[in-house]
Regions:
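N-terminal Rossmann NAD(P)H-binding glycine-rich loop of SDR-like oxidoreductase domains
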Residues: 4-25
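Adenosine-cofactor binding site in Rossmann-like domains, unifying the SAM/SAH pocket
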Residues: 30-52
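NAD(P)H-binding glycine-rich loop region in Rossmannoid oxidoreductase-like domains
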Residues: 46-82, 93
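Glycine-rich NAD(P)-binding loop of the Rossmann-fold in SDR/ketoreductase-type enzymes
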Residues: 78-89, 97, 153-156, 197
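Conserved Rossmann-fold NAD(P)-dependent oxidoreductase catalytic core, especially the SDR/UDP-sugar
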Residues: 89-144, 148
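Conserved beta-loop-beta element that borders a ligand/cofactor-binding pocket
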Residues: 106, 149, 159-184
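Alpha-helical substrate-binding/gating segment
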Residues: 167, 177-185, 196-218, 226
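Conserved C-terminal active-site "lid" loop/helix of NAD(P)H-dependent oxidoreductases
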Residues: 218-244
Length: 256
């Protein structure tokens, strides 16, 4: 039986490498990145040029779209000139080439301003004394977007563009509002005890998206591990996709 062909745009970054390493044994994986990497399955192209990337979409089952400047502190000029165009081009190339599904790497920063409100501000500050983690109101994907900067605005644009291509062209687009993923694969500050997405759970989430039913045409999902102080709702990730996180950031508490 032939393996599904998976294309990862922006494949040479941290998240791209985690996903590539985590799924390569199950799928035929090729990557695109503007950086020239000494890997025969990664091709050096720039996603801001539709003509450059289009040939690589032929025969692909699922695209994992990571191509963007990953810094949450990127100025609007970078988001406008790079991230928006990369996202739109990926969706357009997918439709033009008959790709079935795009997994769009959105971000928790599309709703980051909720962290100014209680109880979320107390959680990300580590002020747990007056909180009952068992009864926290969770932030759901049907709540209004509240971007916390140009980067978050760009991710909200990507979700909207994905909805358009899904409705207009029948493309399946699954948007992942990814939590905290870092090289160390552990919490590095107090906020991360709520927001960590471990490398292993990231791979689990991506595989669940790849294998989700074909009739799942659009969805927005938070990507986070099963952390005690998690305040993003992942019930739709579990119900729609079968995502089952295994890790909890509390395992790192008081280990330093």
């Amino acid at each position: 039986m032939n393996k599904k062909k998976i294309l990862i745009t922006g494949s040479s970054g941290l998240v791209g490498n985690v996903i590539r390493n985590g799924i390569h044994s199950e799928y035929e994986v090729i990557g695109l990145d503007q950086r020239n990497e000494e890997c025969k399955t990664v091709h050096a192209v720039n996603s801001i040029c539709l003509k450059e990337i289009a040939p690589f979409f032929e025969g692909v089952d699922t695209v994992i779209d990571l191509a963007s400047n990953p810094s949450q502190f990127s100025p609007w000029s970078v988001i406008h000139e790079n991230n928006l165009l990369c996202t739109y081009n990926c969706l357009q190339a997918a439709v033009d080439s008959g790709v079935k599904r795009v997994i769009f790497a959105s971000s928790n920063h599309a709703t980051g301003m909720y962290e100014l409100d209680e109880p979320y501000n107390s959680i990300v500050s580590g002020n747990y004394d007056e909180l009952d983690f068992g009864s926290l109101p969770l932030i759901t994907t049907d709540m209004p977007i509240r971007p916390d900067g140009p980067y978050g605005i760009g991710k909200a644009f990507g979700e909207a563009a994905g909805r358009y291509f899904s409705d207009q062209d029948g493309l399946s687009v699954l948007c992942l509002r990814i939590g905290t993923v870092n090289k160390q694969n552990r919490p590095l500050d107090i906020r991360h005890y709520a927001t960590l997405l471990s490398h292993e759970d990231l791979v689990r989430l991506v595989i669940s998206c790849i294998e989700a039913p074909h009739d799942r045409k659009f969805g927005i999902y938070y990507g986070v591990s099963d952390n005690k102080w998690r305040f993003w709702d992942i019930s739709n990730s579990m119900n729609d996709l079968g995502y089952s996180p295994k890790d909890n950031a509390e395992l790192w508490r008081d280990t330093d």
